[in-house]
């Protein structure tokens, strides 16, 4: 138990030193940098060309959803590749773990599919039109 606690202590000290190192570098750079804002520095840079239009463009959320799904399955490959290289040494328990891992990701993919996040062209919802009813004034004149 003491050895395990000591190992976690080493990891904690390493993480703490990493955070201190990054925060110290960030704060030092922020204190030492000159602050000279001007319109040229704040303008949009387009590979040396003059910017056309606004840089604030709305992107469709579907791009982000597709990118997130790609990243999820890309990370799955990163996790499954080392498992596949040592499959024979790990035995059947590791196979079951890998199948559960892949199954959870497939369930997430099916959920995204059923929800419609994978449909690139979605049908636009149409608002049903109400049938026109005669106004009370029109119906009163017919009597």
UniProtKB/Swiss-Prot annotation:
This protein's UniProt keywords: Cell inner membrane, Cell membrane, Membrane, NAD, Quinone, Translocase, Transmembrane, Transmembrane helix, Transport
Any Pfam family hit: Oxidored_q4
Function: NDH-1 shuttles electrons from NADH, via FMN and iron-sulfur (Fe-S) centers, to quinones in the respiratory chain. The immediate electron acceptor for the enzyme in this species is believed to be a menaquinone. Couples the redox reaction to proton translocation (for every two electrons transferred, four hydrogen ions are translocated across the cytoplasmic membrane), and thus conserves the redox energy in a proton gradient.
Subcellular location: Cell inner membrane
Taxon lineage: Bacteria, Pseudomonadati, Chlorobiota, Chlorobiia, Chlorobiales
Catalytic activity: a quinone + NADH + 5 H(+)(in) = a quinol + NAD(+) + 4 H(+)(out)
Taxonomic superkingdom: Bacteria
Membrane topology qualifier: Multi-pass membrane protein
Enzyme class: translocase
UniProt-listed Enzyme Commission number(s): 7.1.1.-
Protein name, entry field: NADH-quinone oxidoreductase subunit A
Molecular-function GO terms, alphabetical: NADH dehydrogenase (ubiquinone) activity; NADH:ubiquinone reductase (non-electrogenic) activity; quinone binding
Gene Ontology, cellular component aspect: NADH dehydrogenase complex; plasma membrane
Species this chain originates from: Chlorobium luteolum (strain DSM 273 / BCRC 81028 / 2530)
């Amino acid at each position: 138990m003491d050895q395990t606690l000591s190992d976690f202590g080493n990891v904690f000290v390493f993480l703490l030193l990493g955070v201190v190192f990054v925060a110290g570098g960030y704060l030092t750079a922020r204190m030492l940098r000159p602050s000279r804002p001007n319109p040229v520095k704040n303008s949009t840079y387009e590979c040396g060309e003059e910017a056309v239009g606004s840089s604030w463009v709305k992107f469709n959320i579907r791009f982000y959803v597709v990118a997130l799904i790609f990243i999820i399955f890309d990370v799955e490959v990163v996790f499954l590749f080392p498992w596949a290289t040592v499959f024979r040494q790990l035995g059947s328990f590791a196979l079951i773990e890998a199948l559960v891992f892949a199954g959870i990701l497939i369930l997430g993919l099916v959920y995204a599919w059923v929800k419609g996040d994978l449909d690139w062209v979605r049908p636009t919802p149409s608002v049903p039109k109400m049938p026109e009813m005669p106004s009370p004034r029109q119906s009163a004149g017919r009597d």
